[in-house]
Amino acid sequence: MEEGKNWIVVPTWRVPGRMERWHSLVKHLKYRTKDLEEVRYVPHHKVGWAWWTCSRVIFPLEGESHLEIQAYWNLTPEKGWLSSHSVRLTWYTEKFWTDVTPDCADSLIHSTYFSCFTAGEVRRAIRGEKLLSCCNYPQAHKAQVPSLQYLALVVVQQNGRPQRKGAARKQWRRDHWRGLRVARQDYRSLKQGGSEPSAPRAHFPGVAKVLGILA
């Protein structure tokens, strides 16, 4: 009797298109800006026996926990789904693991990586002083109920930069997408074999935004 197939079912998030944008952004933030210096990036040729895995990105978090973003490809070749990818988002410790949503993944990453407003910024904003810190991961706050202090600091951060009159909002949008732009530029430079000087620390657009996840 012929043995049937053994299926492994895990929750995944489908990603339209290819994964170069995600890989380029991770490598840019790990090797150039050093924002993700402690993150472990495992490309497909180093994964080993898991041939369906395109890459693994492991974020060490606080308290000996980790967040892993594992990208899959060639999931159902018998149905012709060769050009599609998906990702699995897993939070785990030594004795426990669970799958998380992109919003939760953003919050976990922001709790360890990328700076946010410090406690003293509210007092500085009230006194009309220049803010000494800013939030480089605004997408991580999207799923949360924002406090009045956070909303006020966001407004100060957007409008308090030295910009021409009426250009502050447009500049904020440019900064929000800068992470994607530098990722594309970094990917092109790697393909051409060139090298560029280190770029300044960039805002992180968020896991769902970068991957283009379709819920």
UniProtKB/Swiss-Prot annotation:
Q: What induces it?
A: Expressed late during infection in a Rev-dependent manner.
**Any idea which residues bear Phosphoserine here?**
147
Intervals of motif HCCH motif: 110-141
Identify the Pfam families for this entry: Vif
Which processes are annotated in GO (biological process)? viral life cycle
Coiled-coil region(s): none
Key word Amino-acid biosynthesis present:
no
Q: State which residue ranges cross the membrane.
A: none
User: What's the protein's topology in the membrane?
Assistant: Peripheral membrane protein
- Reported modifications of this chain: Processed in virion by the viral protease.
- Tell me which UniProt keywords the record has, alphabetically: AIDS, Host cell membrane, Host cytoplasm, Host membrane, Host-virus interaction, Membrane, Phosphoprotein, Ubl conjugation, Ubl conjugation pathway, Virion
The listed location of motif BC-box-like motif is 147-156
What note about domains is in the entry? The BC-like-box motif mediates the interaction with elongin BC complex.
> Which protein family is it in?
Belongs to the primate lentivirus group Vif protein family.
The subunit field of the Swiss-Prot or TrEMBL record says: Homomultimer; in vitro and presumably in vivo. Interacts with viral Pr55Gag precursor and human APOBEC3G. The interaction between Vif and APOBEC3G is species-specific, which may play a role in restricting the replication of HIV to humans. Forms an E3 ligase complex by interacting with human CUL5 and elongin BC complex (ELOB and ELOC).
Q: What is this protein called?
A: Virion infectivity factor
- Origin organism is Human immunodeficiency virus type 2 subtype A (isolate D194)
Gene (name only): vif
